[in-house]
């Protein structure tokens, strides 16, 4: 597809890299010649220096005939205007990044009235991701599939886990184990697969069955009632608002006095402390060792790493760190900090998923596609037509390909987590997992 990206910052470059590597014809627009030169040296893309709200520049970039224009400059207003102009020129789809909290309540109106395909807010997306992780303290990651209707929870088995040494068919649970990561490899397991301590497994089921599974297998995380947030930026604001609305105790540490005053005004139910959250003495004075969770959200990766390691050392139940450089992920993992969030990656992945769905929905029934397990597994949702070869046949009688799993069936708005006796019917939407070595297409049974 022909894609134009306006803005070559962290997020713009990430999108350019992913989309060009997937074979799309990408043109990047930015006013900074030095940044564009770097991108042009690294990636096989067209680079155009200029202003994204210039009709002449947009036309030169091919916005009039592109399949998608993505505006991710540092200014919300520029992104919105850029998409409006691109639509007028003839761009089929447009996506704008809008980050200002003042626009948050107007996002739906902006998207609908201006004819945008999608609006993204990396800070809000990151806050939502953190909030989900705090709901399930044992989870390292939570993926939402099938347009948010199916949850995939990822967690690590300890060496003494009651699941270690057990084959999946021996698990007396309605939870479906979808993927297992072990020693750098990712597997879609069958019933004979034996779990080991240290495995990172992803499961899906109804919330009730997941809770029961965690209880019976001893995977119990302390319910989080209090959260300490270090840093008072946009993510902290969105997260604190979500937590306060859920009735949790929230304490925010921020060193900028004006920002503290603003947060106190916007978040009356949160306790806002004016102080340096990287000061370990202050952290202890504010009862770090008594809080259920700490989230490090300063503007500096190094501070977030140190704060998170300090909290882990003091056995805080759940520790989450924001990092912009994913190379720090391994360092934190070795230090016992399992959970990290990278805002620009979260939103970039949403856009990449949108692009993949655009590309793969052209005539083959695929409605959405998400990559899991470090990109080794694809989750595909497809609509079942009457001509589908496996209609009305129980899953246990199907000769499914190895490395292929039917994770859920959506029928009449209801999610079914299938057993062997369930069958696929015409009109269903089916969520399947397939190893990336297999070609991306609607399910073939054998």
Name each model-derived stretch.
Residues 435-446:
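Single conserved hydrophobic/aromatic residue that forms the stacking wall/gate
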């Amino acid at each position: 597809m022909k894609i134009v990206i306006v803005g070559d910052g962290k997020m713009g470059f990430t999108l350019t890299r992913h989309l060009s590597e997937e074979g799309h014809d990408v043109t990047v627009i930015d006013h900074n010649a030095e940044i564009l030169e770097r991108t042009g040296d690294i990636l096989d893309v067209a680079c155009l220096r200029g202003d994204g709200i210039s009709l002449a520049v947009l036309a030169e970039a091919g916005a009039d005939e592109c399949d998608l224009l993505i505006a991710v400059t540092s200014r919300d207003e520029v992104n919105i205007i850029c998409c409006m102009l691109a639509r007028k020129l003839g761009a089929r789809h447009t996506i704008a990044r809008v980050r200002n909290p003042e626009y948050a309540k107007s996002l739906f109106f902006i998207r609908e009235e201006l004819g945008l395909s999608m609006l993204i807010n990396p800070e809000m997306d990151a806050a939502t991701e953190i909030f989900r992780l705090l709901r399930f303290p044992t989870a390292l990651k939570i993926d939402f599939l099938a347009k948010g209707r199916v949850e995939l929870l990822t967690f690590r088995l300890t060496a003494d886990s009651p699941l270690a040494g057990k084959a999946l068919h021996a698990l007396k649970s309605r939870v479906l184990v979808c993927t297992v990561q072990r020693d750098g490899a990712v597997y879609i397991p069958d019933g004979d697969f034996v779990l080991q301590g240290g495995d990172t497994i992803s499961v899906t089921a109804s919330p009730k069955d997941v809770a029961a599974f965690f209880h019976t297998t001893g995977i119990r995380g302390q319910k989080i009632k209090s959260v300490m947030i270090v840093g008072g930026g946009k993510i902290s604001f969105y997260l604190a608002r979500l937590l306060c609305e859920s009735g949790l105790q929230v304490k925010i540490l921020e060193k900028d006095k004006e920002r503290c005053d603003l947060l106190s005004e916007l978040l009356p139910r949160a306790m806002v402390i004016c102080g340096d959250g990287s000061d370990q003495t202050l952290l202890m004075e504010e009862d770090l060792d008594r809080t259920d969770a700490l989230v490090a959200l300063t503007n500096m990766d190094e501070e977030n790493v140190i704060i998170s390691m300090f909290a882990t050392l003091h056995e805080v139940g759940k520790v989450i760190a924001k990092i912009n450089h994913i190379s720090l992920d391994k360092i934190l993992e070795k230090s016992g900090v399992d959970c990290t969030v990278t805002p620009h990656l979260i939103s970039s992945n949403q856009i990449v998923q949108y692009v993949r769905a655009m590309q793969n929905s052209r005539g083959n029934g695929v409605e959405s596609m998400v990559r899991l397990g470090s990109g080794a597994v694809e989750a595909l949702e497809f609509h079942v037509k009457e001509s589908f070869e496996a209609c009305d046949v129980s899953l246990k009688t199907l000769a499914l390909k190895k490395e292929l799993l039917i994770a859920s069936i959506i029928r009449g708005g209801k999610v079914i987590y299938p057993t062997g006796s369930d069958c696929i019917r015409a009109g269903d939407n089916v969520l399947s997992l397939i190893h990336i070595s297999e070609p991306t297409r609607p399910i073939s049974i054998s």
